[in-house]
Amino acid sequence: MNKTTFENVYYWEGKAQIPQEGQFIKLKEDKTLEVPDNPIIPFIEGDGIGPEITQAMLLIINTAVEKTYNGSKKIYWVELLAGDKAEEKTGERLPQETLDVLKESIVGIKGPLGTPVGKGVRSINSALRRAFDYYSAVRPVYWMGQATPIPNPERVDLVVFRENTDDVYAGVEFFAGTPEAKKVREFLIKEMGAKEEGFPEDVGITVKPMSEFKTKRHVRKALRYALENNKKNVAVIGKGNIMKATEGAFINWAFEVAEEPEFKGKVVTDPEAEPGEGQVKLTKVITDQMLMQLVLKPEAWDVIIAQNLNGDYVSDLAASLIGGPGFVPSGNIGDGYALFESTHGTAWDIAGKGIANPLSLTLSGAMMLEYIGWKEAAQKVYDAVRRTLAEHIGTPDIASGFQKQGIEAKAVGTMEFAEEISKRIE
């Protein structure tokens, strides 16, 4: 793929090229950001369609920043390697250099990264989350004008906060028939009083850790977001009626956070009360009920706080309501450190064809602009995407969605779509 030439984009050449013109974002003692007018922001193209959608994102975000600030602010983009390209160039799928520059940069963005199946290779996405303690996966879901499978898609405007470090994703598993599984089974039966009928000899076991500390920091982030953005109805979900020690505890800890001095008087927990000015309402909802409510009345919820596994389910269902993950941005956020990303996979079947939908990564780029305080530029991106979709212009998947609903649409390639959006940035 031929790369578009950007004077403020520094591609990897034997090592990361750090521009002298740029400055690194700084993390203050209170974990807020000190953002210069010329921040260095690293990007990872990713695998599959990653390079194509990254080029599109760079064009759109650069255009929005230039149109908004007329040169007084500029991002200096630095390419880092991870995934297939990193393995090809360095022999490692996640080079130490990438981790070092991400640490110094505080904020970054990446395309999709694959994990080879059956080769014993650990997920790079998981490794990055662990390295920088990105403990909240934040996924806004809203309609931009695309064809959708549900009527009145404007009803969908919510943000899923998925806890990113706890739960069954901890990866502590014991496969059926192994000595380890046998040892754990015997311990549970003999020492912990577990019933033998629940743990037959051929049982496999996965551990589901959930801690008070990790839960509460995640809930605080979600409640702060809701209060700062005037999001009134907040749900904390889980199967606490079944898994009392984990998901039940998660819900209880969420309500304890609501009673902390920071939130006292700002978070309404009475089921019969309505939130007033400057308040939000926190409601407990069983996970299966939430899945049903998202389909039947998505407008009921503004923010959903979830555990890792339930958040995985809920965020994908919510995305499906507005056309799928190709329209949804995402940010992995910790205490200051943040890595924004596309929500979809590598899509190797269309890689290199120049037809991939770049909106997920582009909207993640706009989300990143908001995160560093450049909200005016972010809004220009959102407005331009809406204008472009309102004219029924998009990559083949977007155009096909319109056509299936009897709407005439214009199908364009990835970069042409990015150019159409950029032309509409005002």
From Swiss-Prot:
It catalyses: D-threo-isocitrate + NADP(+) = 2-oxoglutarate + CO2 + NADPH. Mg(2+) binds at D312. InterPro entries: IsoCit/isopropylmalate_DH_CS, Isocitrate_DH_NADP_dimer_prok, IsoPropMal-DH-like_dom. Keywords: Glyoxylate bypass, Magnesium, Manganese, Metal-binding, NADP, Oxidoreductase, Tricarboxylic acid cycle. NADP(+) binds at H344, G345, T346, A347, W348, D349, I350, N357, K404. The keyword Protease does not apply. The record marks Y169, K239 as: Critical for catalysis. Binds 1 Mg(2+) or Mn(2+) ion per subunit. Its cofactor is Mg(2+); Mn(2+). GO terms for biological process: glyoxylate cycle; tricarboxylic acid cycle. It comes from the Bacteria. GO terms for molecular function: isocitrate dehydrogenase (NADP+) activity; magnesium ion binding; NAD binding. Disulfide bonds: none annotated. Its EC number is 1.1.1.42. The keyword Cell inner membrane does not apply. Pfam families: Iso_dh. Signal peptide: none annotated. D-threo-isocitrate binds at S123, N125, R129, R139, R162. Homodimer. Catalyzes the oxidative decarboxylation of isocitrate to 2-oxoglutarate and carbon dioxide with the concomitant reduction of NADP(+). Belongs to the isocitrate and isopropylmalate dehydrogenases family. This is Isocitrate dehydrogenase [NADP].
